[in-house]
Amino acid sequence: MAALLCAGTVSAKTLVFCSEGSPENFYPGINTTGTSFDANSQIYSRIVDFERGGTTVVPGLAERWDISPDGKVYTFHLRKGVKWHNHRDWKPTRDFNADDMIFAIERQWKESNPYFKVTSSNHSYFMDMGMPKLIKSVERVDDYTVRVTLEKPEAP
């Protein structure tokens, strides 16, 4: 009984993640391995996600999105009230918003972005998906709406 009570206390403070290998990093922008993608999927939320066990696109940080008739303009309507995580060394002062989505895209897309090389200039997944040539523009419509315009219709 005492061992069971102690185990409960430890598990409340310890995260155990079973994986086939060690993640190479915990920044999804430079992931190249399945182990890193698997580990990061438990930490980070995405704009859209896949239905569990399938390929149907479902809401994530975007509660909904519109696609233009020509398939080139995606307008993402972001969820309100999404909080950043808390840590003793960093206290977020605002909710997630359109600026964060734009930052996440531009730090991988634009070499002129001051954060392009902070973690690595090798944003291989983003590059391998052809995103730099596919994205024409990313615009903030309002605090919770982002418009992404593509050079051609495509759903990578």
What is each of the regions a protein language model found here?
Residues W109-P156:
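Surface-exposed binding/hinge segments that line
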Residues E20-P23, N31, R52-G53, D70-K72, ...:
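Solvent-exposed coil/turn segments that connect beta secondary-structure elements
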Residues G29-G34, V82-P92, L134-S137:
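Second-shell loop/turn segments in exported
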Residues C6-A12:
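Sec/Tat signal peptide C-region and signal peptidase I cleavage site
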Residues Q42, T56, G60, F96, ...:
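Extracytoplasmic/secreted proteins, especially bacterial periplasmic and envelope-associated proteins
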Residues A12-T14, G21, Q42-Y44, G60-A62, ...:
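Extracytoplasmic
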Residues E63-P114, R147:
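Aromatic- and charge-enriched surface segment that lines or borders ligand/interaction sites
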Residues C18-D70, E106, N113:
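N-terminal lobe/hinge region of extracytoplasmic solute-binding protein
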